[in-house]
């Protein structure tokens, strides 16, 4: 059988092949948004078998197994690692046309040298044995070095002491590992008990009693300063929508007091006004320090109550939300811009219908401060597939500047997911190569190739100042 993952995988023209092999393939990776555990990097985690590195914590794979009718004990339960791997392998043939099929075979090829068999129930034993042999010498740091990673930005709560980032920074590990300030829990006022528990952690980290809304802002500012001192230059906010709810300071204070001292339910409009206020305050902090601010907009989380109670969050029970936030986004950006507090911003939407809306909106707020200052982020989560990436690239190309795009990221908890950069680069080169062949772009490989190199490496390196 011809190798599925070959040198020209996804590259359907000679121009695509030239672009990829000459301008993209060997570029270092700037993975500016991921969910890797910095402790696992610092401690150079090793794995006993492929199930641990491949299936542990990967809710993408878990969802596919559930869709294939696999019992939960083989997914997150007490089945053996070998049994779990077998069940995932049996699911693989059902995944044709799902990006997981491509991702998995790219990972098998790049990290384990397995490119001569396709994973299935029948080949599971062979792949298990071959992969586990390689894992004897493969570690977290080795995965990063082998993938030519230059820098990563993890995702960290403001209460983190950043111990492991400090350890990595003081070591001889050549990959930059920077924290990202992600204060989502400071917004989550609807759940009184959880919010109060979180504020207790924030109080301890910031060394302040939080008894008012102003105290909350002081605490966040102290942690923001601490993160900056430890190399952080990026923030991230996971929000269900963008809010624009005008409220007086005393109303925000009343809502905060209700959150920390009352069992009275907070009304949706009160929560929206509070979240809008905190988001704007944090945006101002980001701008003052010259950080890049990221907004991830739109997921509908924890849909399955039974499974949420059994497994908690981030277990594969989130989906695409839907809201109309064009006007709110306009007002949000305009208010920050008018106050001189709109810094570099990347907006990721989970619903593909919002691609053009956001891309067009961002053109209203560009600046000579930095070319491509405000960006539509790469296709995210459920859109992280060939079709979703293509649609996102079309929106950027048609309504913004493709040549200023900062490119791809993994958004992953897995040390094997760096092949997603390769996947994106191959698609980008295939799109541009196809248009060169059809005469829609100049047949000038150097011209188009420079755009490819910029998106793959130069643009994110400059944008994030890494």
Where are these regions (language model features)?
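Metal-cofactor-binding active-site regions of metalloenzymes
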Residues: 2-289, 341-343, 347-359, 363-466
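A short acidic, glycine-rich active-site loop
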Residues: 268, 317-323
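Hard-cation-handling environments
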Residues: 299, 304
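Short glycine/proline- and charge-enriched loop/turn segments
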Residues: 308-316
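Divalent-cation-assisted or electrostatically stabilized phosphate/pyrophosphate-binding catalytic cores
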Residues: 325-329
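Short, basic/hydrophobic alpha-helical segments
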Residues: 332-338
